[in-house]
Amino acid sequence: MSQFWRLDGPLQTLILAAEQERLPQVIYWGPPLPASEDCAALAAAHAMDVTGGMLDANPELSICPEASQSFPGQPGLICRDAQGRVLHPKFRYVQELAQEHSLCLTYADKDLDLTYEAHFELTASSNMISCWSRLEASQPLMLHWLAAPVFPAPQLSDAMMSFSGRWIGEFQTHSIPWRPGIHKRESRSGRSGHEHFPGLILPEIGARNTLGRAYGFHYGWSGGHQMIAEELPDGRRQIQFGHACDSHNGLAQSF
């Protein structure tokens, strides 16, 4: 069974797709698509072929990649129970709350009593997509990492634009070539600043200040944060933003 959700604005469309009630993945994020667009055809075009030496199925790059699905990169959630055992949730669909410009998806792992929520909101006035995630547990646990809903990075990009700086030297840009593995920026100072601006721009090849296409990310949090841009062994790319690892001291049930 396939499920599809979409948010439409005057300048962009976001489409998510899920299979077998698993967590969805972003299959399209770009210029507006007509309401009649065949989402099933888009999902089929988005799927990767299986070749020699590969697994029978490619683990999905979902909005919260799961280690339990043999995802080969950075998972979207890393947590432990009160005894320190690593938890590997398998989230399944529970419900959705869809409005014209917002979407809330709820998933749960009944065995571990964990509930995950992903929120998406497209503000028509700014044409920006805001998204955030929540985790609820029936028993106290220790959270190491929880990413905001994860987005794929464009394949037509050969570099990313990151930012650093200092007093009277703000917003210095750095072009970082894409390569296999993780590029990580982290602020553990408890605040944002010139040194670790929580933003990223992904220009497609040939994009300039006045032409071409680019994708922008900004983590709306003025505290410690972490950004991960990863190219997987199979060539797919993901962008994760979240609070700095181990920001939550001690045990808790709501994150």
PLM feature spans:
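Loop/turn positions that initiate beta-strands
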Residues: 252-254
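Contiguous, structured surface segment used for ligand recognition
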Residues: 17
